[in-house]
A protein has these predicted regions:
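Mg2+-dependent phosphoryl-transfer enzymes with acidic/Ser/Thr/Gly-rich catalytic loops
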Residues: 2, 9, 14, 34, ...
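Short, well-ordered alpha-helix to beta-strand connector turns
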Residues: 16, 48, 71, 78, ...
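Active-site phosphate-binding/coordination module
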Residues: 32-127
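Anion (oxyanion) recognition and catalysis
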Residues: 45-46, 159, 240
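Conserved acidic, metal-coordinating active-site core of Asp-based
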Residues: 115-222
Length: 267
């Protein structure tokens, strides 16, 4: 089980200069971005802690995050791309050529639709048309959440799909099942993002991550300074590698709690 956030030594916490974070139900809570969360991101930025959202959210959502939020950049669609802003210029990096990414997505989309046809009432995510790479199935966003059994059944079927002979990945977040083709992941793209930003000189002790669900496990297994917001509790039995620490509060309020802890450690 994760330890309390207060068990993290202030000596170790004050070294953190990069905070990677999930978005839905980690920065947000019940579909809203709390004012406390936005203020926490701003305070972290002012203190020299670079915040990088790493999300399964669509490209359209990521564009406004990069433009409007006090963040260093954003990694979207579970690592398919990232966006940074430097000297008023936006830079996009894609894990595969953009045209190839869209071609594979179109092919995958038709296959996922065929799977969903056997489940009346199940739909794609409302933001599917704003996605570059993945296909998202709505399991809990603005609808009654699906049962654990049905989610597991869907994951099993979706993971059996192929795109031009290549297997697909499928992972569960708090609101969607995200399905994509390619070797990218939250972890691999976060590693590449950090290596690019630091010219390859990455110090694990300076990096932290916070998340809330199963699709954050690769990040928990990579980053030693890993934190779960309190609402990760129902997912803990599913995690072979849970976060090291956990906040007392849920979602964005838990993120603000983490931010205040990191800022206090630097005082």
């Amino acid at each position: 089980m994760p330890k309390l956030l207060t068990d993290w030594s202030s000596q170790a916490a004050k070294r953190v200069t990069w905070l990677f974070t999930d978005v839905d139900d980690t920065l947000t809570w019940r579909g809203k971005l709390p004012a406390e969360t936005l203020d926490a991101m701003q305070q972290l930025s002012l203190a020299g802690i670079n915040v990088v959202p790493v999300t399964g959210a669509c490209a359209g959502w990521c564009d406004q995050i990069a433009r409007l939020w006090p963040v260093h950049g954003v990694i979207g669609e579970n690592g398919a791309f990232w966006i940074t802003k430097r000297q008023q210029q936006f830079h996009h990096h894609y894990c595969v050529p953009f045209s190839e990414m869209r071609k594979r997505q179109r092919y995958l989309l038709e296959q996922v639709k065929q799977v969903l046809a056997s489940y009346p009432g199940l739909t794609l995510a409302n933001d599917q048309s704003f996605r570059f790479c993945d296909v998202a199935v709505n399991i809990a966003q603005d609808r009654t959440p699906l049962s654990v059994e049905l989610i597991e059944e869907l994951l099993l079927q979706l993971r059996q799909l192929t795109v031009f002979g290549d297997p697909v990945q499928a992972t569960e977040s708090s609101i969607h099942i995200n399905v994509w083709t390619g070797n990218h992941s939250k972890r691999s793209s976060s590693q590449s993002y950090l290596s690019q930003a630091l010219n390859g000189e990455v110090n694990q002790g300076e990096v932290a991550y916070v998340g809330d669900s199963c699709n954050d496990e690769p990040m928990f297994s990579w980053i030693n300074n890993s934190v779960g917001v309190n609402n990760i509790t129902p997912y803990l039995p599913k995690l072979a590698c849970p976060p090291q620490y956990m906040t007392r509060q849920n979602g964005g309020y838990g993120f603000a709690e983490l931010a205040h802890f990191l800022l206090s450690a630097k005082e």
